[in-house]
Every structure is written in structure tokens, then in C-alpha cells.
Swiss-Prot record:
Pfam family, one: Fn3-like
Pathway in which this enzyme or protein is active: Glycan metabolism; cellulose degradation
Identification of the protein by name: Probable beta-glucosidase L
Function recorded in the entry: Beta-glucosidases are one of a number of cellulolytic enzymes involved in the degradation of cellulosic biomass. Catalyzes the last step releasing glucose from the inhibitory cellobiose.
Subcellular localization: Secreted
Annotated catalytic residues: 252
Gene Ontology, cellular component aspect: extracellular region
Catalytic activity: Hydrolysis of terminal, non-reducing beta-D-glucosyl residues with release of beta-D-glucose
GO annotation (BP), single: glucan catabolic process
Length: 739
């Protein structure tokens, strides 16, 4: 098997990537090097070593030097808001942000999160998430990321990071690399093939680095037999040399395993500084690192490089200019002395609303038109009676599901439950509500029988492996709805002729039992919508907004169709290679239930006028390395466009999607891969033009012999449509043999 970094040497190096960075990084490095000269050795070590768990107000804190005007750095979760603080906004999860396929909303969500972090004095917000990518559909933390597709995930990473850092907080791209399951995450070795690593798992991190991300977090697992946080191949060779990353690499909390090896292999900051329980010998850096530099085990230049990278990131986002002090403590209930939420609930609602995916809509069941009566069935329709924050880190499944569990969470300032929002709308419409906020099938059937239409709420939860919920150790045990959701739907469908199913889930669930019920006329996926859950749902099911979300993953007919799942072992050889999610379904000829990129609307769209203009030559990318990779890899070499017309009677947004098929001269490759998308908002009868700019990277595959990105020669296939399988326009272009 070809393994990651096959041809790379194991020798430790000190990498200086800043010389090839953009002007902002260059200026930041100039200032960082000046500051470095003023620090003594103990202060340098203090900048790269956490003060220990609960040693400061944040989940991660560094020592404050006296020689320069630089703070104790505050590092804080999470990728969807601020953990352990209130009041803050509980935004929709990453998987919902990805399902919007909306670059403006992705940026706005990142900017709002960054503004709240800065307002609380947080220097580093621990997100966004590119790993797990989500190769295992039941992986526990998939929902923290944006999509199983690396292109969509990469765009979302770029927009989110730019939004966060434009607001003044340092972003942290995580988890680097191969952290695809929670079972055995502290011991498992992710043995990833070199090509699959680059084309799938590294790809969105390239976009993060290109966007100027300040920091990267290495993961708990091993990669090809070496701990991720002390892998020279992973951190020095790939991240810092190949991707030209000028920022710093921090450990996940307690993911460090050594003093010298981690230092010389590219780790720049250790968190939280000591083990949670702080046993003797658990501090790998601090005085131990200072001693290792003194005896020559770690070069002085390596320590100076760590510090320079950390200082440069601080200068890069302007945190030296009037940055607020830390305004909360994670350990006393998180009550902040400032309110940073502003109007961010509006952003949260927009993301939640535009991420909703309409999976089925038989007989125009939706939108609702002032029904005389509605049965609202299922515990997922209401807020946890004990309160939305009753379970630490959301480690329970009681009431409506609006985020998964673990460190990637935030405290709800409020949570609008679906029943509450529907009742408010129903009161205005004169609709009678018949509630059954329980998962008991008999009670649900009774409520449904007394109403014109029944809406059944079901869910499926997951999270981080340090919490087990209902027997699920982070990863989901299966892809079925929780709390006997299938039986609940069957009972309601037997009692009602008009059933709508709403799904709150961390990822795909198998829907065959539900679809087998003739009375189920509509199915809505609402994901993990955050604090504005009910309001966003009402916006869509009542037709105030036309649904425009698209699936960020495939929904299969049976779990076995995915060809991947978390494994009960300490080694994962990633046997699926490149063939993950729709790439696997396409290559194997497996019909999904709902394909990647799928989503219905209340209107219809017609595609026409495909236009392709290409000026690319075959060959390898050989340009100077800039943040993200070789500069020529990101050159625009072509353009594809298509017209999209709204043929319906209501306004709606359509996500036009571009997929490419590589020529036969390329080694075995999935039949098609996403390489562009654009969301168009169109009034009835209006035509818009979707335009996709293609770079050399979009046309390339990773050549394991050359260790370069290569554009193959021959005929490329062009597919444009409404999903990965609903292709409306096809074309092709040829790439000549060249440089």
C-alpha cells in the first residue's frame, strides 16, 4: 500500500516558511523577530507551554512574559461558538453551515463568532474543523466539520477563517490529521495512502493555510504509526514545507507524548501544558523543554522558531492593538461581564434556515397553508424540560437536538424549540395544535388521529468520545433514528393520512422504514440548527423562505452501502482510499436514497447554455511555495458557466454544482468530483448565470512518484447540475500535453 509521505525522510528540521508568505505574514514576522530578541529563555518557553488545565480563565492559557507587551494567550473552544461562557450565541453546527452552500453566510457566521471571541478577550478560537472529514458516516464528530467532500469543506474553511480573523481572533484549523473516529482516538493509527491523504484529508487544510489561518491543531491519533503531534513528516514536511504554513501548530489537549521528539518534529505549542490530573512527569515542555535546549537535544533555533510563529500570528490579526482583556472564566459558570451577542441571532437564524434540506415533498404538502389542526409529535419537538444546558457539554439526548455533544459545543443563551415556534405561528393562523411531546408510539398515534396533519420529530445524536450517551461512545452505534424513531413514525403514519417528518441529526440516517409509510408525504432534514432552531424551521415549512439547503453528504439505503464505518481496532488502514461518500457510490454503481448535493425547493430550475473556456497545460505544479502550496497550483486556468432559470411561481435559491471527471491518462480516479458551486437567488421567471473558475489544483491529482500535483492530459468531462446525480448539462474540454 502506498502510504502517506512515502518518499519523505525522517530527519527533523526547523522549517522557516515565512519568507514565502504574503505581505501580511512578512510584516508580522518582522515584528515577531524584533520581539523575540527581547525575551529571555524562560519567557520563550512560557510562550509555547500551557500553564496547565484550569490554570487560567480559558481552556488553554500561556504564560505572560514581562519583557514585551504580550498577554497570557487565551485559547477557547468551540467551532460553533464560545464554550463555557455566557451569554454567547449558539450558532448552527459546521455541518449545517456546509449545507447552506452559501459563501456569504459561511463568512458571516465566521465573522460573528470571531467578534464574540474578541469581545470576550479570547485570542484563539479553536475552530473551524476540517478533520474529521467524515469518511465514516457514523463518526462522532463529523457534525463539527462542514462536509465529507474536501472541496466543499475547503471553501467553508476558507470563508470561515477569513470571517473569524477579519474580526480579530486567531482561528485554529483542526484536527490535523486522520482523526476520523472517536473509538480508540488516543491510540489508533490512521494509515492513510499518500494520494488519498492529499486529495481528501489534506485538501481543506490547504484552503485553511491559503486563507491565512493563524494556527493548526494536531490530533490525538497516530498517522502511519507516528503520533500526529510528533510526526516530522506530517508537521515539518507536509504542513510547513509543502503547504508553506507560516503559523504555529498546537497540540490537542494532552495529545503530546514527548519533549524532544515533538519539538524537533514541528510542534510549536503544547496544550494545556500538563495532564488534566497533573500527575508527576506529565509536563513535557516547560522546564523540561528549557533543559532540552540547554543540553542541545532541541536546537535553540527550533525554540526561537516556535516563539516567532506564535508571535507572528498574534501580530497578523492585530491583537497588539487595543485587544480586550479576558472577560469571563470557564470555571465559575462562564458568566461574562460583557454581552457580545449583538445581532448575531439573526445570522444564526439565517444559517439554520438556509441549511434546511427538503428531502421529500409529495403532493405539495409543504409549505403549510394554515391547516385547521396540527399534531406535533416526539420529544425532539420540545426543549429539554430541565433546560437546554442541563447536561454538561450537551452530553445527553433529552428534548430537541440542536448541537451534538463534547468540546465542540456552546452554552445556549436560549433555544427556540420547534413546538414553541409552531405554536406561535399556529396562533396567528388559527390552527389548533395537538401536542404529544413524547416518543411513545401510542400517544403519538392518538395525537395524529385528532389532527389534519401530523409533524413527527426524530433525531440522531453523537459527539466526542469522553462522553457516552445512551451507549454511544462518541461515534454512533448505527444509523437508525434514536428513541425508536422508526416505530414512532410508523404509528403516526398508521393514524394519519398526512405526515411530515422532521429530522435533527448529526449526519445521515437510514430512512427506508419511514419512506415505506404511504402517509409520509414530506421529509425535512434540519440538522443541528443551534439556538434559532424552531424559528428557522417555521420560516421554511410555512413558506416564508423557500428551502435551499443541499446535502453535504450522501444518505444511503442501507448502512453497508457506505463501505466505511468506525472500526473496533487500533489500526485503520483506510482501505476505501479515494472512494468516500458519493465517490464510492458512483464508482460502485450503488444507488443512494438521497445523493450528495441533493435538496428540493418549492420552485423548479432549468439549466441551459453550458459554456467552457479552458487554457491549461498538462504537467506538474512547480511554482514557489506560498501559504497553501505551490503558487501555480492556485492559478485560474479556465472557466465554466451555465444559465439557471427559476421556472416556478415563487422566489428561490438554487445551488448550481460543477463536477469534473479526469481523463483516462490519470490513475484510477472517482468518476466525478465537486470542483465548483454557486448559490443563485432568483425571482420567478428570472435567469441567472453561475460561473465557476477552475484552478490547476481543480484539474490535478496527486502523483505519488513525483510527489507533486499533476494535471493529466486528455479529455476532461464537465458535469453541471442540481446535485451529484441530477446532472442538467454536460460538456468536455481537452488539456494538451505540455510543460
Amino acid at each position: 500500500m502506498q502510504t502517506l509521505f512515502l518518499s519523505l525522510l525522517a530527519a527533523a528540521v526547523t522549517v522557516h516558511a515565512y519568507g514565502s508568505g504574503g505581505s501580511n505574514w512578512d510584516q508580522a514576522y518582522s515584528r515577531a523577530k524584533d520581539a523575540l530578541q527581547k525575551l529571555n529563555q524562560t519567557e520563550k518557553v512560557g510562550l509555547v507551554t500551557g500553564v496547565k488545565w484550569m490554570g487560567g480563565p480559558c481552556v488553554g492559557n500561556t504564560y505572560k512574559p514581562e519583557s514585551i507587551d504580550y498577554p497570557s494567550l487565551c485559547l477557547q473552544d468551540s467551532p460553533l461558538g464560545i464554550r463555557f461562557a455566557n451569554p454567547v450565541t449558539a450558532f448552527p453546527a459546521g455541518i449545517n453551515a456546509g449545507a447552506t452552500w452559501d459563501t456569504q453566510l459561511l463568512y458571516a457566521r465566521g465573522a460573528a463568532m470571531g467578534a464574540e471571541a474578541k469581545g470576550l478577550g479570547i485570542h484563539v478560537q479553536l475552530g473551524p474543523v476540517a478533520g474529521p472529514l467524515g469518511k465514516n458516516p457514523n463518526g462522532g464528530r463529523n457534525w463539527e466539520g462542514f462536509s465529507v467532500d474536501p472541496y466543499l469543506s475547503g471553501v467553508a474553511m476558507e470563508k470561515t477563517i477569513r470571517g473569524m480573523q477579519d474580526s480579530g481572533v486567531q482561528a485554529c484549523a483542526k484536527h490535523w490529521l486522520g482523526n476520523e473516529q472517536e473509538h480508540y482516538r488516543d491510540t489508533i493509527s490512521s494509515n492513510i495512502g499518500d494520494r488519498a491523504a492529499h486529495e481528501l484529508y489534506v485538501w481543506p487544510f490547504m484552503d485553511a493555510v491559503k486563507a491565512g489561518v493563524a494556527s493548526v491543531m494536531c490530533s490525538y491519533n497516530k498517522v502511519n504509526g507516528t503520533w500526529a503531534c510528533e510526526s516530522d513528516a506530517l508537521n515539518n514536511k507536509l504542513m510547513k514545507e509543502e503547504l508553506g504554513f507560516p503559523g504555529y501548530i498546537m497540540s490537542d489537549w494532552n495529545a503530546q507524548h514527548s519533549t524532544v521528539n515533538s519539538a524537533v518534529s514541528g510542534l510549536d505549542m503544547t496544550m494545556p501544558g500538563s495532564d488534566f490530573s497533573n500527575p508527576p512527569g506529565s509536563i513535557f515542555w516547560g522546564s523540561n523543554l528549557e533543559a532540552a535546549v540547554a543540553d542541545g537535544s532541541v536546537p535553540q533555533s527550533r525554540l526561537d522558531d516556535m516563539v516567532t510563529r506564535i508571535l507572528a500570528a498574534w501580530y497578523l490579526v492585530g491583537q497588539d492593538q487595543g485587544y480586550p482583556p479576558v472577560a469571563f472564566s470557564s470555571w465559575n459558570g462562564g458568566k461574562a461581564n460583557v454581552d457580545v451577542t449583538a445581532d448575531h441571532g439573526t445570522v444564526a437564524r439565517a444559517v439554520a434556515r438556509d441549511s434546511i434540506v427538503l428531502l421529500k415533498n409529495g403532493h405539495g404538502t409543504l409549505p403549510l397553508r394554515k391547516p385547521k389542526s396540527l399534531a406535533i409529535v416526539g420529544s425532539d419537538a420540545i426543549v429539554n424540560p430541565a433546560g437546554p444546558n442541563a447536561c454538561s457539554d450537551r452530553g445527553c439526548n433529552n428534548g430537541t437536538l440542536a448541537m451534538g455533544w463534547g468540546s465542540g459545543t456552546a452554552e445556549f443563551p436560549y433555544l427556540v424549540g420547534p413546538l414553541d415556534a409552531i405554536q406561535k405561528r399556529a396562533a396567528a393562523d388559527g390552527t389548533k395544535i395537538v401536542p404529544s411531546a413524547t416518543d411513545d408510539p401510542t400517544a403519538g398515534a392518538s395525537a395524529a388521529a385528532a389532527a389534519e396533519t401530523a409533524i413527527v420529530f426524530i433525531n440522531s445524536d453523537s459527539g466526542e468520545g469522553y462522553i457516552t450517551v445512551e451507549g454511544n461512545l462518541g461515534d454512533r452505534n448505527n444509523l437508525d433514528p434514536w428513541h425508536n424513531g422508526n416505530e414512532l413514525v410508523k404509528a403516526v403514519a398508521a393514524a394519519s393520512k398526512n405526515v411530515i417528518v422532521v429530522i435533527h441529526s448529526v449526519g445521515p440516517i437510514i430512512l427506508e422504514t419511514i419512506l415505506a409509510q404511504p402517509s409520509v408525504k414530506a421529509i425535512v432534514w434540519a440538522g443541528l440548527p443551534g439556538q434559532e432552531s424552531g424559528n428557522a424551521l417555521v420560516d421554511v415549512i410555512y413558506g416564508d423562505t423557500t428551502p435551499s439547503g443541499k446535502l453535504p453528504y450522501t444518505i444511503a439505503k442501507q448502512a453497508a452501502d457506505y463501505g466505511a464505518s468506525w472500526i473496533n481496532a487500533e489500526t485503520d488502514d483506510f482501505p476505501e482510499g479515494l472512494y468516500v461518500d458519493y465517490r464510492h457510490f458512483d464508482a460502485k454503481g450503488i444507488a443512494p436514497r438521497y445523493e450528495f448535493g441533493y435538496g428540493l425547493s418549492y420552485t423548479t430550475f432549468k439549466y441551459s447554455g453550458l459554456w467552457v473556456n479552458m487554457d491549461a497545460s498538462a504537467g506538474a505544479a512547480n511554482g514557489q511555495v506560498v501559504p497553501g502550496g505551490p503558487a501555480d497550483l492556485f492559478e485560474v486556468v479556465g472557466q465554466v458557466s451555465v444559465s439557471v432559470r427559476n421556472n416556478g411561481r415563487v422566489a428561490g435559491a438554487e445551488v448550481a454544482q460543477l463536477y469534473l471527471g479526469l481523463p483516462d491518462s490519470a490513475p484510477a480516479t472517482p468518476p466525478k468530483q465537486l470542483r465548483g458551486f454557486q448559490k443563485l437567488m432568483l425571482q420567478p421567471g428570472q435567469t441567472g448565470r453561475a460561473t465557476f473558475k477552475l484552478t490547476r489544483r481543480d484539474l490535478s491529482y496527486w502523483d505519488v512518484q513525483q510527489q507533486k500535483w499533476v494535471v493529466p492530459s486528455g479529455t476532461f468531462k464537465v458535469y453541471v447540475g442540481s446535485s451529484s446525480r441530477d446532472i442538467r448539462e454536460e460538456g468536455s474540454f481537452r488539456v494538451r500535453r505540455g510543460w
